[in-house]
């Protein structure tokens, strides 16, 4: 079974935001075009979770984990649809609270989903490489990396949130979700390493690549405080977002391809 295309195609997909930027240049429609691309890749991420979940029997732990992970793109997609066709982002309107609720639910789903995936090794009785102390240290390092990447933006968003700005609260919720998710990347990486040499390495390895893509996506939030070129940082942000979602789809397809129903977790 050849999984190399699943590794290569996400990098090809990640070229799309750059091609859009090159084609449109400094056009005022660039941001709109990239927003449309973002909507598509969020659908891709949701599809990935559904495809992966379908690889397991109903009620299986891994099915629940993937479906929970899929709540994040599902709620964000609902938010996008509502604010594209119905609601507007005006200060002091109920729509602000609707957006905050949907982002909270999306981040709760993301945290719960990554947490469930990160403890799959325990459910399956797999021995992870390294001692428990070393794993705890690596999780601590992952947490610090998450704080370093999202911290500066969160400080600004905290100030906005304290002044009653719902957008600041929404961004703050997203930042907290990202920090927790980054801390949980470590068990996912170690699970992939424990699976090396077998077919199950591929879905876990590709999932690791997806989570790394999200880390790079959030890193652009730090870069935009240094680089004043908004189009530059926006393009890179959407490039890494696309990479993360495409790798997630590859992971979902790979999970399904290895016929996981025969090796489903209890």
Language model segments and positions:
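Polytopic alpha-helical membrane-helix bundles and their juxtamembrane interface segments
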Residues: 1-266
């Amino acid at each position: 079974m050849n999984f190399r295309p699943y590794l290569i195609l996400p990098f090809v997909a990640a070229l799309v935001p750059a091609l859009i930027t090159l084609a449109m240049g400094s056009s005022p429609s660039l941001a709109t075009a990239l927003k449309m691309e973002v909507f598509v890749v969020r659908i891709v991420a949701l599809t990935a979770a559904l495809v992966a979940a379908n690889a397991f029997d109903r009620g299986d732990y891994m099915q629940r984990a993937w479906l929970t992970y899929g709540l994040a793109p599902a709620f964000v997609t609902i938010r996008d649809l509502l604010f594209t066709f119905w609601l507007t982002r005006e200060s002091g309107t109920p729509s602000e609270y609707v957006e905050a609720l949907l982002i909270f639910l999306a981040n709760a789903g993301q945290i719960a989903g990554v947490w469930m995936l990160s403890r799959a090794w325990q459910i399956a009785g797999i021995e992870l490489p390294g001692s428990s102390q070393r794993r705890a240290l690596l999780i601590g390092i992952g947490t610090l990396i998450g704080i370093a990447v999202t911290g500066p933006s969160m400080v600004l968003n905290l100030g906005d949130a304290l002044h009653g700005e719902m957008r600041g609260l929404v961004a703050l919720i997203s930042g907290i979700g990202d920090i927790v998710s980054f801390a949980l990347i470590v068990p996912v990486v170690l699970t992939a390493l424990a699976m090396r040499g077998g077919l199950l390495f591929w879905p876990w390895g590709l999932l690791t690549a997806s989570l790394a893509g999200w880390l790079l996506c959030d890193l652009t939030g730090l870069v935009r405080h240094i680089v004043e070129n908004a189009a530059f940082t926006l393009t890179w942000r959407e490039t890494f977002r696309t990479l993360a979602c495409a790798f997630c789809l590859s992971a979902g397809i790979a999970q399904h391809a290895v016929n996981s129903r025969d090796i489903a977790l209890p």
